[in-house]
């Protein structure tokens, strides 16, 4: 939805998205935004945790593998991993719950398949098709796939071993801090 608001006699456009949420037992957290043009007045907004959103994009990726038709899951996940710090434990808990609910087995075979897609021309063609659709030229498929694999590998290993993962994702570094 596109909105505009008037601040100091100027109209400021902004966009808000409302996405359906299919998860359970997830509560929005409050975030405060500072309005610089309004004497640093703050407003509160409620948003679902970015860890849950990341897990919801990971589920179709690990469930459907190369049969995934909607490459937007890769795009959205790449955007999240590039911008937001994440708590690995929360992503692991959310992804584990979603996998159990959808009967997705956390196995080495799934990881081997997924990790090999960096050089898989079929997936690269699907990625380039998405980029044309959204009128972008980058990032390259190998960059997107590499970032997602660096993020998912330690989480997936702990899911397979039924252990808890402790690590904080740092988007500036493109890796976890353990």
Positions of the model-derived regions?
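Structured mid-to-C-terminal alpha-helical surface segments
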Residues: 1-178
């Amino acid at each position: 939805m596109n909105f505009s608001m008037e601040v100091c006699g100027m109209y400021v456009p902004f966009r808000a998205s409302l996405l359906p949420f299919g998860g359970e037992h997830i509560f929005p957290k409050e975030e405060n935004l500072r309005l610089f043009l309004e004497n640093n007045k703050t407003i509160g907004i409620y948003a679902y945790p970015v860890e849950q959103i990341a897990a919801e994009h990971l589920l179709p990726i690990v469930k459907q593998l190369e049969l995934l038709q909607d490459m937007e899951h890769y795009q959205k996940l790449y955007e999240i991993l590039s911008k937001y710090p994440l708590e690995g434990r929360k992503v692991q808990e959310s992804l584990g719950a979603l996998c159990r609910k959808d009967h997705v087995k956390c196995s080495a075979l799934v990881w081997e398949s997924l990790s090999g897609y960096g050089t898989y021309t079929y997936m690269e063609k699907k990625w380039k098709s998405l980029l044309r659709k959204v009128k972008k030229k980058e990032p390259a498929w190998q960059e997107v796939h590499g970032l997602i694999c660096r993020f998912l590998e330690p989480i997936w290993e702990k899911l397979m071993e039924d252990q808890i993962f402790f690590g904080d994702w740092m988007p500036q570094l493109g890796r976890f801090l353990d």
